[in-house]
From Swiss-Prot:
Family the entry assigns: Belongs to the Maf family. YhdE subfamily.
Cystine pairs: none
Official protein name in the record: dTTP/UTP pyrophosphatase
Cofactor(s) for this UniProt protein: a divalent metal cation
Length: 192
């Protein structure tokens, strides 16, 4: 299997589930003309996948994209500390959505799975000291929404409604269920 992603979290989730894969990243510009946020994220994941799949028609290719959305606005990876502070301040005390889209394809076997998983996360009310402490960990700067639920960022989270691993970057349970539906046995996932 080829993972079309540099995300350390996705790699960790897939390795922990027993998948063997190689990483080949695409160099597409992560933009989409789709108006609906979930369609836009799925479109970006598909573009990442297609760039790799067209040159690897006999391989399974997996691509994904994750965003944090608050009140219709996407919070990507912060450009600097000030933007990260603003993101976290805006998330403070509120419920936001984490949207992960993934596409799994094998051209020669005519296999295609397209999926979007939406989870909700509620943050505690965060004071400036807590936000600055978290920023000092350097954890938020390579993550959508400026936090990682699997690290120090977990202390910011009051509750979640949805898939923890999707919030982390890849909905492994959903993916495994989709593989079962198309006839792949979980005991053979290291062969995919």
């Amino acid at each position: 299997m080829i993972l079309a992603s540099n995300s350390q979290r996705r790699q960790e989730i897939l390795k922990d589930a027993g998948f063997n894969f190689k990483v080949i990243t695409s160099n597409i510009e992560e933009i989409s003309d789709k108006k609906n946020i979930t369609e836009r994220i799925l479109d970006i994941a598909e573009k990442k996948l297609e760039q790799i799949a067209k040159n690897n028609i006999n391989e399974f290719v997996l691509a994904a994209d994750t965003v944090v959305e608050l009140d219709g606005k996407i919070l990507g990876k912060p450009k600097n500390r000030e933007e990260a502070f603003r993101f976290l301040k805006s998330l403070s005390g509120k419920v936001h959505r984490v949207i992960t889209a993934y596409v799994f394809k094998n051209i020669s076997k005519n296999i295609l799975i397209r999926e979007v998983v939406v989870s909700e996360v509620k943050f505690f009310d965060l004071d400036d000291d807590t936000i600055n402490w978290y920023l000092d960990t350097d954890e938020p700067f390579d993550k959508a929404g400026a936090y990682g639920i699997q690290g120090y960022g977990r202390i910011l989270v009051e509750k979640i409604n949805g898939d923890y691993y999707s919030i982390m970057g890849f909905p492994i349970s959903n993916f495994l269920e989709n593989l079962r539906k198309i006839g792949y046995k979980i005991s053979l996932i290291d062969k995919i």
